[in-house]
């Protein structure tokens, strides 16, 4: 009936008539029907009570199925408690109540129900409860904070992992210390959250708290760096996005973190630094030029150069002299290799464009000297001749 988009009032009446039927799959259908009603209309108190009854009293789940081997050493639901939870009655009803809480007309009622659900011993159900809990902050920050602390009272790492977004919105300078145990548990997780590793996400939020001068945030960030390379990756990424900022203190701290790992040289860190050029804006080039120049002198650029070149291709028309300065370090750059990268001709194109744009004869001569030098290297010679021939043809 939901798929056929029947009349909302008819669907409501059917839900209220048959919701007590005790069948797991049927009850999941009831929850989906209430979800449809919630999206198309208002969920009234009767429907909220139905969800509450399911979330608090239904026997499903009976066990943590996500921890059980489904065969061949792979646990059910890939070992993910949230995916497991939303495929159970209590978990699905809980998730629907929390999502409804974003726009509910009955926030006090929702808080009361969620507070009872927080006592559920099921990790899967509590993951469903905490995943979207941040939506309740707008109704009452203090109640949401207390609810978060209750849900995570056992500091289970999976529950904390799915509560990281809510944690991010709840943390202030005054309550930061109360979240340190949660952050320390999350730091050791070697798994993904959505599209990124938990460690990378942690690196970003730990650096944010450090930039905001939260008490003990520097100590926690340093602990994170010792714990996980992924935390370093997240911090590098976050720092690169704050190298230009209205607050000079934030700029200085971001620069120090950005520069800190330039010579560490692991494959992941090398790749992360190249990816940082996706965060840079052309109009900010002069503000971060000194950092880019230092980067161009490091050994790490030998392995990953593609995004670096793409950024220079965007700025060369505006700052050809600075691009020529950077090209002087070409021996450090990743070499073109059709088997592994798409760098063919990029360095040569940037250099020729810089030469054509620059006015100062000193820089023109510098560009020619670099060009003569790269022609001595086979990996560049063929591409250089090809590009020059194309320019001659007009």
Place the predicted regions along the sequence by residue.
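Non-catalytic all-alpha helical scaffold/repeat segments
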Residues: 1-394
């Amino acid at each position: 009936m939901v798929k056929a988009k029947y009349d909302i009032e008819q669907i409501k009446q059917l839900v209220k008539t048959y919701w007590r039927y005790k069948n797991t799959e049927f009850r999941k259908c009831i929850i989906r029907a209430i979800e449809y009603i919630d999206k198309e209309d208002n969920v009234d108190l009767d429907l909220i009570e139905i969800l509450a009854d399911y979330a608090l009293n239904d026997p499903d789940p009976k066990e943590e199925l996500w921890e059980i081997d489904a065969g061949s050493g792979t646990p059910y639901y890939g070992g993910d408690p949230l995916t497991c939870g939303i495929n159970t009655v209590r978990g699905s009803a809980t998730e629907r109540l929390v999502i409804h809480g974003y726009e509910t007309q009955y926030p006090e009622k929702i808080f009361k129900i969620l507070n009872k659900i927080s006592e559920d011993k099921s990790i899967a159900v509590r993951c469903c409860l905490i995943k979207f809990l941040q939506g309740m902050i707008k109704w009452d920050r203090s109640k949401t904070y207390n609810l978060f602390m209750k849900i995570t009272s056992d500091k289970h790492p999976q529950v904390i992992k799915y509560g990281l977004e809510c944690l991010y919105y709840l943390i202030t300078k005054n309550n930061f210390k109360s979240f340190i145990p949660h952050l320390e548990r999350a730091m050791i997780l070697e798994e993904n959250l959505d599209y990124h590793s938990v460690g990378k996400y942690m690196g970003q939020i730990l650096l944010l708290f450090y930039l905001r001068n939260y008490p003990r945030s520097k100590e926690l960030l340093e602990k994170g760096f010792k714990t996980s390379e992924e935390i370093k990756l997240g911090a590098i990424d976050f720092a690169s996005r704050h190298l230009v900022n209205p607050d000079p203190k934030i700029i200085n701290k971001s620069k120090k973190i950005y520069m800190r790992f330039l010579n560490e040289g692991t494959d992941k860190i090398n790749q992360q630094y190249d990816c940082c050029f996706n965060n840079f804006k052309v109009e900010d080039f002069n503000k971060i030029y000194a950092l880019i120049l230092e980067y161009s002198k490091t050994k790490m650029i030998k392995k990953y150069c593609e995004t670096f070149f793409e950024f220079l291709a965007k700025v060369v028309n505006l700052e050809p002299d600075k691009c020529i300065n950077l090209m002087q370090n070409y021996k450090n750059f990743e070499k073109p290799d059709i088997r592994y990268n798409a760098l063919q001709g990029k360095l040569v194109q940037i250099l020729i464009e810089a030469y054509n744009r620059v006015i100062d004869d000193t820089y023109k001569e510098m560009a020619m000297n670099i060009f003569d030098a790269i022609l001595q290297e086979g990996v560049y010679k063929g591409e250089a001749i090809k590009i020059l021939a194309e320019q001659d043809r007009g």
